[in-house]
Amino acid sequence: MASLRRLTELLCLPVTATAADIKTAYRRTALKYHPDKGGDEEKMKELNTLMEEFRETEGLRADETLEDSDPEPEESGYATFENVSVPDIDGAFFKLMKLKKCMQTYFSVNERRKQDIRPEYFELFKAFQDVPWKVLEDFFTSEMF
């Protein structure tokens, strides 16, 4: 805490300055005290030391807030790395194949529907054509699971 007070003194900032204010003032003051610019070498060393301490404590605070804000896997919507059962895999496979069959039926040429084809149909048809159905079938039927 004393080092923060000394840092804000050296930077000519109030003690209530934000981290962004401190970083901006540090850049400005570093140019002023830099030995290559004719500044005071001792003050530059002190400024660098205090700024390093500030960055470390700022990093610790950021780590603490990250730890507190990490959602649990079941809350985040992301899958966990638990084992998936064979019935779950089979269920997913059969749902994909049912979707494939429904889409094939939809995309089959029907004389009555030809007059009602809209641009959305063509976009959906192209997306359906781009799905690697053979790869999915091979993946789900492999002995890997």
From Swiss-Prot:
Its main location: host cell. Residues 6-82 form the J domain. Residues 58-80 are annotated as: Disordered. Keywords: Activator, Early protein, Host cytoplasm, Host nucleus, Host-virus interaction, Oncogene, Phosphoprotein, Transcription, Transcription regulation. Residues 65-75 have a biased composition (Acidic residues). Coiled coil: none annotated. It is found in: Host cytoplasm; Host nucleus. Promotes efficient viral genome replication by accelerating both G1 and S phase progression of the cell cycle. Interacts with host PPP2R1A; the interaction inhibits PP2A activity. This is Small t antigen.
